[in-house]
């Protein structure tokens, strides 16, 4: 990496921090505060892309001059509905019931910005769930894992036992597609 540039992750997600570290980059972390609200007619892909870009741009305002800032967001889409982080057990139960025994999409957007340029990508992965019982959903909620996850599950944790198949990027489902993220960062080197 050029010595004049410093990489900054605009996220408090421990999963994104761990995944970015896997790419071998040194980076700092800033915690941008943006409103995550879907506009009424906004398509899922446009929404997740907008959020990743807003996070990166807000992070750029918090970072040192000459920083390169990475923002990312993930949503789960089922029947053209965006499933974000659950607000309650009832919300989580509804999401997991909707995903039960079906295919859905996980969309992760990554935006990398500097004061001179910006590059973004959206990675969509198809995920299939086994049929879930009410008991499995209740036990999973009790584990605490679904609380901070889009779609109310984490493929890298206990929620992985619900997944029968994926087509696409496993790392994108976790929160940061490694290949695509590295390609974006390379644009700034």
From Swiss-Prot:
Its cofactor is a divalent metal cation. InterPro entries: ITPase-like_fam (IPR029001), Maf-like (IPR003697). SUPFAM superfamilies: ITPase-like. Pfam families: Maf. It is an enzyme of class 3 (hydrolase). It catalyses: dTTP + H2O = dTMP + diphosphate + H(+); UTP + H2O = UMP + diphosphate + H(+). Keywords: Cytoplasm, Hydrolase, Nucleotide metabolism. Belongs to the Maf family. YhdE subfamily. It comes from the Bacteria. One of its GO terms (cellular component) is cytoplasm. This is dTTP/UTP pyrophosphatase.
């Amino acid at each position: 990496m050029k010595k004049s540039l410093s990489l900054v992750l605009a996220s408090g997600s421990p999963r994104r921090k761990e995944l970015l570290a896997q790419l071998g980059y040194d980076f700092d972390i800033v915690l941008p505060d943006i409103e995550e609200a879907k506009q009424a007619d906004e398509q899922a892909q446009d929404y997740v892309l907008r959020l990743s870009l807003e996070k990166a741009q807000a992070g750029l305002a918090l970072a040192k001059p000459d920083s390169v800032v990475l923002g990312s967001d993930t949503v789960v889409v089922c029947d053209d509905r965006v499933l974000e982080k659950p607000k309650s057990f009832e919300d989580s139960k509804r999401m997991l019931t909707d995903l039960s025994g079906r295919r859905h999409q996980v969309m992760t957007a990554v935006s990398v910005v500097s004061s001179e340029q910006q590059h973004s990508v959206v990675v969509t992965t198809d995920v299939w769930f086994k049929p879930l019982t009410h008991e499995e959903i209740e036990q999973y909620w009790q584990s605490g894992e679904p609380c901070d996850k889009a779609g109310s599950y984490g493929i890298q944790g206990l929620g992985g036992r619900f997944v029968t198949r994926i087509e696409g990027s496993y790392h994108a489902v976790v929160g940061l597609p490694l290949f695509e993220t590295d390609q974006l960062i390379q644009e700034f080197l």
